[in-house]
């Protein structure tokens, strides 16, 4: 009782010193609205920071009650034993090659005397209990100077696909531990500008364009990014996925690849043994890099199939990582490619992961009322040393509130003390579409509830599968000697039907306490569309962008967490949050074999419409202004059926047949009684006693002749028809 009374007195007395600044328990926080881009020019950007929601929490130390400061978006990265002084960070797009500098243009501050700031506990692992780690005052408390010293700094430059960036860090709290003086900067304005010197970690753009699929990411990560900075590639580029699969699973992956192409994601297969034999991490890394650097720059996803012994993770001291395969440009930890894994030890393990993924994207209907229900799980630990000074329960409550505001209809909260495996089993079996876990973990279980791999067989949530954002130690250690927690959930099935989860992000190592909380916050904010410039619809996109925010704020520790936070499942999975609604889709029932385009009307802008032929993509387009105009990239044969597939966020997938009719330019004749030659723009056709006709790609007849024809063409694709001796031949001709 005496301890609590001292804490309250400390807060009240200290509050009066700052004239209205609050000293209280941690509050719900989002992005700091007081950080603004004042100007952005070719070689310089100005950024303004203003203090927002400064709060203090009293904690008991060897020197009595000391204060732990927090403010909106402030992050404690102070070294162990030094004063806890949060910083705030923002990323800027910078010169591709020049070194940058930061200068303070103006600042305002107030000073308060006789303030004891608590020492940092450093980076705390989730294998530990923060409450059992004492506050230890280090050597810095004997130094008569302000910490950390500079109020604005730049981190090392990084590269995110086609854009070079740099983080500007604001340190608005400066503390002299000898005089016990706290300097509070209420406003800081900085200019970040190019210098004449060559920079580090530079980038050379081989073309004046960026891949459209990353535009929203650039806008979200870089506060000064403009889409007009480069000329985007055509929007038809919906990205590309490569599935790297061991030879033994090559045939088993076909249904998955066919579906991905059918729903509009160009997907290819690469047999792992064709990359290297034996398969090594270095070989996988080099292969992904080579594919990324191919013309078009459209590689977006890589799915690894198999366990560690089939396709190894990259192992370096303290790191077991799949994510590094997607870190290609520069020497930083920002992924250019989203990485996921179907971890399997048998064909059955693989089949259930394929089945659950296809069903989730293709077969969900308006009757799937389990969507829109979520599970939040938290330990009873955490507090001042955690992200935003939140306990795990406070953290999950903030997430629960966010989900409710977005439209989730039911939130199940399982908070320690007292959570049991049955609580988790009942939540899964009752139907949930999302689970957030924040707490302790082991290779095979969650610490809160002790729900683990031995309980997975009790799950009966057949094809009612949530995806999971998991903050815990080693739940994703797929190098462990038995299937880890994440693997068990992805392989789970009951009576041959998938149970468990459709995707989970889980760590291969002991996670830090604070930094993954920031990543988890951002994942949920992206999911709930809190950032208009960063709308992501795939599991890989949501999770990786959440981790980008973690790296920006927590620097080196954030990088380590990103490298080891592993996606189990398809990184291109189109996530669902709420009960889907139907789209109104209309399209012709027939298409000419010589058509160049196919138009689809749809009442949901942003939907993806795709024509495919037995798992081969013919063309795809995004719905804009109520229609999608699909350009046909592949030739189509007449008298066949194509499949029109339309997918959309929280929509019922639409699949229709489209019959091909008319003259095909795909039937190329060889060794026939005619010759067709192209010289420049001249098409010459010769055949004795034959009728000759040329059609353009729209099926229009543009030229006719007998026996011999010379036609001056424009650039394009043409069909040449030769009718002779009672037979008709058709040949495709390209004029460039």
Swiss-Prot record:
NCBIfam families: Por_Secre_tail (TIGR04183). Ca(2+) 4 binds at residues 522, 525, 531. Residues 25-229 form a propeptide. This is Gingipain R2. The keyword Cell cycle does not apply. It catalyses: Hydrolysis of proteins and small molecule substrates, with a preference for Arg in P1. Belongs to the peptidase C25 family.
């Amino acid at each position: 009782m005496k301890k609590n009374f001292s804490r309250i007195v400390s807060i009240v007395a200290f509050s009066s010193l700052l004239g209205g600044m609050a000293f209280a328990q941690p509050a719900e926080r989002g992005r700091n609205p007081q950080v603004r881009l004042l100007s952005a020019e070719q070689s310089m950007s100005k950024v303004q920071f203003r203090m927002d929601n400064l709060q203090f929490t009293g904690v008991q130390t060897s020197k009595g009650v000391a204060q732990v400061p927090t403010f909106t978006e402030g992050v404690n990265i102070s070294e162990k034993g030094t004063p806890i002084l949060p910083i705030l960070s923002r990323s800027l797009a910078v010169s591709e090659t020049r070194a940058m500098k930061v200068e303070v243009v103006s600042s305002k501050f107030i000073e308060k005397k006789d303030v004891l700031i608590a020492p940092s506990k450093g980076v705390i692992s989730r294998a530990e209990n923060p409450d059992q780690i004492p506050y230890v005052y280090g050597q810095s408390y004997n130094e008569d100077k302000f910490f950390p010293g500079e109020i604005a700094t730049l981190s090392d430059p990084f590269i995110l696909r086609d854009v070079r960036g740099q983080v500007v860090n604001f340190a608005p709290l400066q503390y002299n531990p000898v005089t016990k003086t706290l300097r509070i900067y209420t406003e800081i304005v900085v200019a970040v500008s190019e210098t004449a010197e060559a920079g580090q970690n530079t980038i050379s753009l081989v073309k004046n364009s960026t891949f459209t699929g990353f535009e929203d990411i650039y806008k979200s990560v870089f506060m000064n990014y403009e889409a007009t900075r480069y000329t985007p590639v055509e929007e038809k580029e919906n990205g590309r996925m490569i599935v790297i699969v061991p030879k033994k699973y090559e045939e088993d992956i076909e249904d998955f690849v066919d579906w991905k192409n059918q729903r509009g994601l160009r997907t290819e297969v690469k047999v792992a043994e064709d990359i290297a034999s034996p398969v090594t991490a270095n070989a996988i890394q080099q292969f992904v890099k080579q594919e990324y650097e191919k013309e078009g720059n459209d590689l977006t996803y890589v799915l690894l199939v198999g366990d560690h012994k089939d396709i190894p993770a990259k192992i370096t001291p303290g790191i077991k990582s799949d994510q590094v395969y997607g870190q290609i440009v520069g020497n930083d930890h920002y992924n250019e490619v989203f990485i996921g894994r179907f971890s399997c030890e048998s064909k059955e393990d693989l089949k259930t992961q394929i089945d659950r993924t296809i069903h989730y994207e293709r077969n969900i209907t308006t009757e799937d009322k389990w969507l829109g229900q979520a599970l939040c799980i938290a330990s009873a630990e955490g507090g001042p040393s955690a992200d935003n000074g939140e306990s795990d329960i406070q953290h999950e409550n903030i997430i629960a509130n966010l989900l409710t505001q977005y439209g989730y209809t039911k939130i199940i909260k399982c908070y320690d003390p007292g959570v049991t495996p049955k609580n988790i089993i009942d939540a899964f079996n009752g139907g949930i579409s999302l689970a957030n876990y924040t707490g302790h973990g082991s290779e095979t279980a969650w610490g809160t509830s002790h729900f683990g791999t031995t309980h997975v067989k009790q799950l009966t949530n057949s094809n009612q599968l949530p995806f999971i954002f998991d903050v815990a130690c080693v739940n994703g250690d797929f190098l462990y000697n038995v299937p880890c927690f994440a693997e068990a959930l992805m392989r789970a099935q009951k009576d041959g039907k998938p149970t468990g989860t459709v995707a989970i992000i889980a760590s291969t190592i002991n996670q830090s306490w604070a930094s993954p909380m920031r990543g988890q916050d951002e994942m949920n904010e992206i999911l709930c569309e809190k950032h208009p410039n960063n709308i992501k619809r795939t599991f890989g996109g949501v999770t990786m962008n959440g981790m980008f925010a973690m790296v920006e704020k927590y620097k080196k520790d954030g990088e380590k967490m990103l490298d080891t936070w592993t996606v189990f499942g398809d990184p291109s999975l189109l996530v669902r949050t709420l009960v889907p609604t139907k789209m109104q889709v209309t399209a012709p029932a027939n298409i000419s074999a010589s058509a160049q385009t196919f138009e689809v009307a749809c009442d949901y802008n942003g939907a993806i419409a795709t024509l495919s032929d037995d798992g081969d993509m013919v063309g795809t387009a995004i719905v804009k202004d109520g229609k999608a105009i699909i350009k046909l990239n592949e030739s189509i044969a007449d008298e066949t059926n194509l499949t029109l597939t339309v997918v959309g966020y929280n929509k019922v997938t639409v699949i229709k047949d489209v019959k091909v009719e008319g003259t095909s330019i795909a039937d190329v004749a060889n060794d026939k009684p005619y010759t067709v030659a192209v010289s420049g723009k001249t098409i010459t056709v010769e055949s004795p006693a034959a009728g000759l006709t040329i059609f353009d790609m729209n099926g229009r007849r543009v030229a006719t002749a007998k026996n011999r024809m010379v036609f001056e063409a424009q650039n394009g694709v043409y069909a040449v028809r030769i009718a002779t001796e009672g037979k008709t031949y058709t040949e495709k001709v390209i004029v460039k």
